[in-house]
A protein has these predicted regions:
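Short aromatic/hydrophobic "clamp" motif used to bind/position activated sugar donors
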Residues: 114
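Active-site-proximal specificity loops/subdomain of glycosyltransferases
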Residues: 59-108
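Membrane-proximal basic amphipathic "stem/tether" segments
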Residues: 1-9, 271-341
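A conserved hydrophobic helix/loop-capping motif in glycosyltransferases and polysaccharide synthases
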Residues: 21-34
């Protein structure tokens, strides 16, 4: 039986002063505000406001216009690896861009702690810069020296959305050596990630038709675990086999800590909040996360896994949203079939 993971209140985490922090801001340079999506200069200004003594590193692409950007200590540009094309949904998958720009920025970080941030976000406080220094680190699956703090956005609760190995990669705060460990990984092979023939999934509230084996968060997490000799082969994005689920719970509760996104001190723009269900209901909350960490007995684990299985195979059929998505899936499938003829 796994040992309980005691997760204290976020208010009991240790705040880290900005003079001990490097901030890696990664992504494209945004010169114009679109709706409530800030410019890169606004991002930099917010970081300087709330983390005044931090080492600020901007990691972007070769050829980007970085003139007149104020508040940068170090700038690094990289060749743009480009997106991986989803030929069914006709949109880009930017996992390789995220890996490269984050990894290159982290290579310049010299402080003990690091905040991984994006060029289209702003800070509203320094609350994200907190660490659970009381965490027990000798247990199996404790891969970081200290847990990495993230916001709750996109840390999927499998009892609602049956997805595992899905931590948040938008904002992360932890020891620099731990973030380097997480992001020090190769570029994803498009021929592996994109199937020659798409798969049709009719189970789960997130039913769909896609050629992608897994989503970016899962790719990055699985590659990180493989470097630690923890090998998990998900059949698809919504694979929730009991064995994989059990491993994920241990990895999640022993290596990550959550701040509820609305109280994290990070301003998420509407583009990241455009689907209210996926930001308000589909993710762990601080309270649910801490409770699950404490309840590590086998019966509790079975109950949580059973809820995830019910969500995938039964409960989805009782939501109108599921049928709307199923209709969109059918239209995607029909369009793909016509294209192949």
């Amino acid at each position: 039986m796994a040992k309980p993971v005691i997760i204290p209140s976020v208010d009991d985490f240790s705040p880290i002063s900005s003079d001990r922090v490097s901030v890696v801001i990664q992504g494209p340079i945004l010169r114009e505000r679109v709706g409530d999506r800030p410019t890169t200069q606004e991002c930099l200004r917010s970081v300087r406001t709330y983390l005044p003594e931090a080492e600020v590193i901007l990691s972007t692409w070769d050829g980007s216009d970085t003139t007149d950007l104020a508040g940068i200590d170090k700038l690094i540009t990289s060749p743009d690896p480009g997106p991986i094309w989803n030929y069914v949904k006709l949109r880009d998958n930017n996992v390789n861009r995220m890996i490269r720009s984050t990894n290159r920025g982290l290579a310049l970080a010299t402080r003990e702690y690091c905040l991984k941030f994006r060029t289209d976000l702003c800070l509203t406080s320094d609350r994200i810069c907190r660490i659970d220094t009381s965490a027990e680190r000798s247990a199996p699956y404790s891969l970081f020296s200290l847990p990495v703090t993230t916001t709750s956005y996109y840390v999927r609760d499998p009892s609602v959305i049956p997805m595992i190995f899905h931590p948040s990669d938008i904002v992360q705060f932890g020891r620099t050596c731990d973030l380097v460990d997480f992001w020090n990984q190769p570029q994803v092979d498009p021929h592996w990630l994109v199937r020659a023939r798409p798969i049709l999934s009719i189970f789960g509230r997130y039913a769909g038709f896609t050629p992608m084996r897994v989503v970016p968060e899962q790719v990055v997490t699985l590659q990180w675990l493989a470097r630690h000799n923890i090998h998990v082969a998900l059949q698809d994005t919504f694979d929730i086999s009991f064995k994989a689920y059990r491993i994920w719970e241990q990895v999640l509760f022993r290596n990550f800590r959550l701040l509820d996104a609305v109280d994290s001190g990070v301003a998420f723009h509407a583009r990241l909040r455009r689907k209210k269900f996926f930001t308000d209901r589909a993710n762990f909350t601080e309270t649910v996360f801490a409770k699950a960490g404490r309840e590590q007995s086998l019966p509790h684990l079975w109950i949580r896994w059973a809820r995830a299985a019910l969500s995938k195979y039964v409960i989805c059929f009782f939501y109108l949203r599921y049928y709307k998505r199923l209709w969109r899936t059918y239209r995607l499938y029909s369009a793909w079939v016509r294209q192949k003829k």
